[in-house]
């Protein structure tokens, strides 16, 4: 038996649309992500458990886990009869890499179960392919940090897919999911097909500056440069009151904030735990729309996916 945990992640991290992603873990030590258990069986079987298992498709062949299993078997050219348990603890369409959690956990679990026929690069490529089939385009800004941990710079080069970027150890990342859903495909469709040259240059300048500030450990400069000129101006239509919320948490003391992935989760950053707790309390009171929503104060998760049992 193999049991794997895969953490939630923040896609884009503001300034890096489809280029940056960060794995997160609550500071209280709890695990925010999905679990996948693989056992030997005489045929494929899938059991869905967890808080959000009722949101998964009833048809097994529409489940991400089945798609991962099939693609893995096709890749290694072997039919592996297994029983898989998915503990779906991440809300679907939340902007926290929910699909990436299931994809990464399943593919790593299958690879471990089969004595690692695929290397890490081959696995990551497979993860990106499955993510692309679900969201409409291959992108690694959730699967890479979920798999590798930390803050990842997505290069998508033929030899190097992703590189780890230094982060700031004293940053608290507050993530707030309101309890609603924004499908990734819908959030991508709302974006323009073309951008002005000036916009592209400005975004490139800020992204380059953020990478430089991360390596030179200038937290205030990095926070100031975490601005999204590519997706946020258009996706705010999908997030009612987003600009109001962003302004309020800035007044409380957030040094940066933005939309996590496609939303509706938002993230904010503080370098002070007391301020982080105040932001968390305000978001809990004002951003959550139902009882399933949540707010977590997190660190970046440097471990990424890991074996639990």
From Swiss-Prot:
It is found in: Cytoplasm. GO terms for molecular function: ATP binding; homoserine kinase activity. It comes from the Bacteria. Pathway: Amino-acid biosynthesis; L-threonine biosynthesis; L-threonine from L-aspartate: step 4/5. GO terms for cellular component: cytoplasm. InterPro entries: GHMP_kinase_C_dom (IPR013750), GHMP_kinase_C_sf (IPR036554), GHMP_kinase_N_dom (IPR006204), GHMP_knse_ATP-bd_CS (IPR006203), Homoserine_kinase (IPR000870), Ribosomal_Su5_D2-typ_SF (IPR020568), Ribsml_uS5_D2-typ_fold_subgr (IPR014721). Keywords: Amino-acid biosynthesis, ATP-binding, Cytoplasm, Kinase, Nucleotide-binding, Threonine biosynthesis, Transferase. GO terms for biological process: threonine biosynthetic process. It catalyses: L-homoserine + ATP = O-phospho-L-homoserine + ADP + H(+). PROSITE patterns: GHMP_KINASES_ATP. ATP binds at residues 91-101. Its main location: cytoplasm. Its EC number is 2.7.1.39. Belongs to the GHMP kinase family. Homoserine kinase subfamily. Catalyzes the ATP-dependent phosphorylation of L-homoserine to L-homoserine phosphate. This is Homoserine kinase.
């Amino acid at each position: 038996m193999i049991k794997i945990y895969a953490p939630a992640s923040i896609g884009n991290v503001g300034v890096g649309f489809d280029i940056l992603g960060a794995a997160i873990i609550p500071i209280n030590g709890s695990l925010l992500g999905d679990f996948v258990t693989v056992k030997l069986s005489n045929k494929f079987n899938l059991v869905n458990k967890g808080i959000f298992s009722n949101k998964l498709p009833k048809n097994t062949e529409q489940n991400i886990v089945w798609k991962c299993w099939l693609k893995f078997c096709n890749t290694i050219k072997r039919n592996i009869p297994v029983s898989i348990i998915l503990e779906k603890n991440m809300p679907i369409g939340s902007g926290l890499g929910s699909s990436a959690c299931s994809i990464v956990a399943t593919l790593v679990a299958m690879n471990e179960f089969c004595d690692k026929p695929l290397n890490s690069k081959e696995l990551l490529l497979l993860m990106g392919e499955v993510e692309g089939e679900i969201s409409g385009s291959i992108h690694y800004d959730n699967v890479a940090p979920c798999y590798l941990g930390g803050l990842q710079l997505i290069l998508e080069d033929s030899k190097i897919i992703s590189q780890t970027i230094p982060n700031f150890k004293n940053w608290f990342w507050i993530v707030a999911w309101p309890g609603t859903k924004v499908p990734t495909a819908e959030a991508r469709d709302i974006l323009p097909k073309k951008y002005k040259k000036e916009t592209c240059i400005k975004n490139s300048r800020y992204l380059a500056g953020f990478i430089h500030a991360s390596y030179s450990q200038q937290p205030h400069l990095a926070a100031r440069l975490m601005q999204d000129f590519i997706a946020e101006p258009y996706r705010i239509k999908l997030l009612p009151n987003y600009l109001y919320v962003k302004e309020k948490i800035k007044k409380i003391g957030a040094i940066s904030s933005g939309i996590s992935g496609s939303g509706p989760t938002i993230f904010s950053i503080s370098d002070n735990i007391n301020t982080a707790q105040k932001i968390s309390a305000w978001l809990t009171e004002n951003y959550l729309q139902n009882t399933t929503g949540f707010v977590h104060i997190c660190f970046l998760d440097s471990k990424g996916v890991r074996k639990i049992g």
